């Protein structure tokens, strides 16, 4: 009912510091021809605004935008602070206008440079008065209180924008603490009788630290920070010439606005009426003017104007042309518009053009490269509106075909199956509570392919007689008999795959597929069956069926390389208990086969239990033993008995003795070594 942006209070610092120049010089060479040497040397043709003038102009422009777009709905107040707080206007509608504010600002005037430098001159006086002003009810809040609405249901929030100049972060922190303390004290006064105004539910404090051009500030910028449950604070340091851009950026977030720049406006030159040039005009309006128009096929062209920090949507001026009623798009909404620079010549020409009863169409580009007329500017009753036109499919158009989906034309949607699913899933009111209602969502399908080409399982349900019944059993409660029947169907499917039968697809036309392609089809069918059973495995019988199918799928690809034992084990898992071969084997089974199967089962369990009891040391020792067995051990360890020391190089020196003995036997002398 009462939003935070319903109340906005500007606190302007009127101390001596704001009398200095902003250091942005404006030329005053209005005469034709070259400037004289005397004027250029003396610099008499330039002047610079003061910090106070920059703050006043930008804040008044802020409230002009608010009052243009929200006439009578949003309120803005001004408080000037020097030795005391000076109230410029009130919440009354008679003072909520530009004439009253500008006349009051003229009476306040620029701060005097001869003003004494004293601690009595402070912005804190204005902040205290701003908190008291927030506690005062507006006309709408007074009407709600008079109608009997409790005070706790009347939301009282507001925003305070303080334009000042601080030395450093410590001074700024002191300012925040004082504001928070006064805010808490004001709520205490409002809660205790006699009540002094409304309690403040929340306050948003925006501090703009203004410095002249080219001066570095010791105050750092800070995003929105929660100081207390009642107060959020953000700090911005900005040069005096750029304060208007900063407030324009802030007003977009404060009032959920958007900036649009109308480009390529043909306009005659002021000095030469025979020629024309293209100009741009920036306007502000509600953000919904763009959000309700754009569809998935459109992207907003944005740009950032020089000197600004916010994005603006660029829409191109569309040359007016004659069109019939069939060419007009339906309007989705209309929103008030106000120009950013109301005093510029392009803005004035566009406003007069619209107020004279003309309309302007605006174009925006599509993603495909073409353009579409998305907005229209027109005036009614002295107010300018932007109309959001419907450039996407509207409710008055025929419904699109389901086959015209994204990515091209799709012709194989399962339309009839989807219709059956919708009929099965329709909701009806019940007079009494159904005890089976909690189990109904579980019975709904959890797997539904949209197209026929994306599924193998549902493509075959018209050609395999048992498949529809199989799919029906998966989504309902299953008993033992249903499980046996499904096992039988899986067994028949496995037998068909073993024989090399081709799945009865429609597109094959009876042609014989290659063996590897048929095998891939069965593999895809097994995979989709497993996915379907997994999503509906709610009972023990479903889980048993899932285990059988998982075993079949894991072994199907490696079936040719399996041994006979593996094949027998595979058959024990894949065959249904009611299959003819299985029934015959069960009738002729002997005690020995039963004993063998039990022994195999016990052996497998024993291996699993032994594997589970192995420690990390056993695993490492086993790995080292297997690695050492691959190479021959040292011969000294093999030949030397346990407890004795093996002799290193036992044959060392024996070769010389053998050579001398052989020489003596043959009578040949061997000379000793030197």
UniProtKB/Swiss-Prot annotation:
This is Protein asunder. It comes from the Eukaryota. Belongs to the multiprotein complex Integrator, at least composed of IntS1, IntS2, IntS3, IntS4, omd/IntS5, IntS6, defl/IntS7, IntS8, IntS9, IntS10, IntS11, IntS12, asun/IntS13, IntS14 and IntS15. The core complex associates with protein phosphatase 2A subunits mts/PP2A and Pp2A-29B, to form the Integrator-PP2A (INTAC) complex. Keywords: Cell cycle, Cell division, Coiled coil, Cytoplasm, Developmental protein, Differentiation, Meiosis, Mitosis, Nucleus, Phosphoprotein, Spermatogenesis. The lineage of its organism: Eukaryota, Metazoa, Ecdysozoa, Arthropoda, Hexapoda. It is found in: Nucleus; Cytoplasm; Cytoplasm, Perinuclear region. Residues 516-538 form a coiled coil. GO terms for biological process: cell differentiation; cell division; centrosome localization; flagellated sperm motility; meiotic cell cycle; regulation of fertilization; regulation of mitotic cell cycle; spermatogenesis. GO terms for cellular component: cytoplasm; integrator complex; nucleus; perinuclear region of cytoplasm. Pfam families: Mat89Bb. Transmembrane segments: none annotated. It comes from Drosophila pseudoobscura pseudoobscura.
């Amino acid at each position: 009912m009462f939003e935070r942006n319903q109340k906005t209070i500007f606190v302007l610092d009127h101390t001596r510091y704001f009398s200095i120049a902003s250091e942005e010089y404006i030329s005053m060479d209005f005469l034709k021809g070259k400037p004289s040497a005397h004027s250029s040397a003396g610099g008499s043709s330039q002047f610079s605004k003061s910090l106070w003038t920059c703050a006043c102009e930008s804040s008044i422009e802020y409230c002009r935008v608010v009052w243009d777009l929200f006439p009578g709905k949003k309120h803005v107040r001004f408080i000037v602070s020097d030795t005391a707080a000076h109230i410029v206007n009130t919440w009354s509608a008679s003072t909520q206008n530009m004439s009253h504010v500008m006349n009051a600002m003229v009476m306040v005037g620029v701060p005097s440079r001869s003003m004494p430098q004293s601690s009595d001159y402070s912005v804190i006086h204005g902040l205290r008065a701003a908190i008291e002003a927030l506690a005062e009810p507006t006309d709408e809040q007074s009407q709600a209180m008079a109608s009997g609405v409790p005070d706790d249901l009347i939301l009282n929030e507001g925003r305070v924008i303080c334009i000042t100049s601080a030395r450093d972060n410590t001074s700024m922190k002191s300012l925040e603490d004082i504001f928070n303390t006064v805010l808490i004290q004001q709520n205490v006064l409002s809660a205790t009788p006699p009540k002094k105004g409304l309690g403040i539910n929340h306050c948003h404090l925006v501090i703009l630290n203004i410095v002249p051009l080219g001066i570095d500030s010791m105050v750092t910028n800070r995003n929105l920070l929660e100081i207390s449950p009642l107060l959020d604070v953000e700090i911005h340091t900005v040069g005096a010439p750029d304060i208007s851009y900063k407030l324009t950026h802030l007003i977009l977030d404060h009032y959920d606005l958007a900036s649009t720049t109308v480009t390529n406006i043909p306009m005659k030159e002021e000095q030469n009426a025979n020629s024309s040039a293209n100009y741009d005009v920036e306007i502000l309006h509600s953000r919904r003017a763009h959000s309700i128009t754009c569809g998935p096929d459109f992207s907003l062209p944005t740009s950032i104007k020089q000197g600004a920090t916010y994005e603006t949507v660029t829409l191109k001026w569309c040359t007016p042309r004659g069109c019939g009623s069939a060419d007009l798009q339906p309007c989705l909404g209309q929103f008030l518009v106000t120009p950013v620079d109301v005093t510029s010549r392009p803005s004035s020409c566009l406003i007069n053009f619209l107020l004279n009863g003309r309309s302007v169409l605006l174009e925006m580009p599509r993603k495909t490269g073409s353009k579409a007329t998305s907005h229209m500017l027109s005036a009614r009753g002295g107010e300018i509106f932007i109309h959001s036109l419907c450039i996407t499919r509207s409710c008055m158009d025929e419904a699109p075909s389901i086959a015209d989906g994204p990515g091209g034309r799709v012709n194989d949607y399962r339309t009839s199956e989807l219709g059956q699913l919708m009929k099965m899933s329709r909701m009806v009111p019940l007079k009494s509570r159904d005890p089976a209602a909690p189990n109904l969502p579980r019975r709904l399908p959890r797997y539904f392919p949209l197209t026929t080409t994306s599924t193998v399982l549902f493509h075959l349900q018209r050609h395999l007689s048992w498949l529809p019944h199989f799919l029906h059993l998966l989504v309902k409660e299953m008993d033992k008999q249903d499980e046996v029947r499904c096992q039988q169907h899986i067994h028949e499917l496995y037998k068909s795959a073993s024989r090399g039968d081709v799945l009865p697809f429609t597109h094959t036309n009876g042609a014989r597929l290659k063996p590897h392609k048929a095998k891939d089809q069965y593999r895809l069918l097994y995979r989709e069956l497993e996915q379907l059973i997994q999503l509906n495995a709610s009972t023990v019988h479903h889980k048993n069926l899932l285990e059988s199918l998982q075993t079949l799928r894991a072994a199907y690809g490696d079936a040719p390389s399996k041994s006979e034992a593996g094949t027998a084990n595979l058959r024990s898992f894949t065959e249904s208990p009611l299959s003819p071969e299985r029934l015959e084997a069960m009738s002729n089974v002997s005690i020995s086969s039963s004993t063998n199967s039990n022994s195999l089962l016990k052996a497998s369990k024993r291996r699993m239990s032994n594997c589970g009891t192995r420690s990390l040391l056993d695993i490492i020792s086993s790995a080292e033993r297997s690695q050492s067995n691959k190479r021959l051990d040292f011969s000294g360890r093999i030949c030397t008995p346990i407890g004795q020391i093996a002799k290193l190089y036992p044959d060392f020196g024996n070769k010389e003795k053998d050579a001398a003995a052989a020489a003596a036997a043959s009578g040949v002398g061997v000379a000793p070594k030197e």
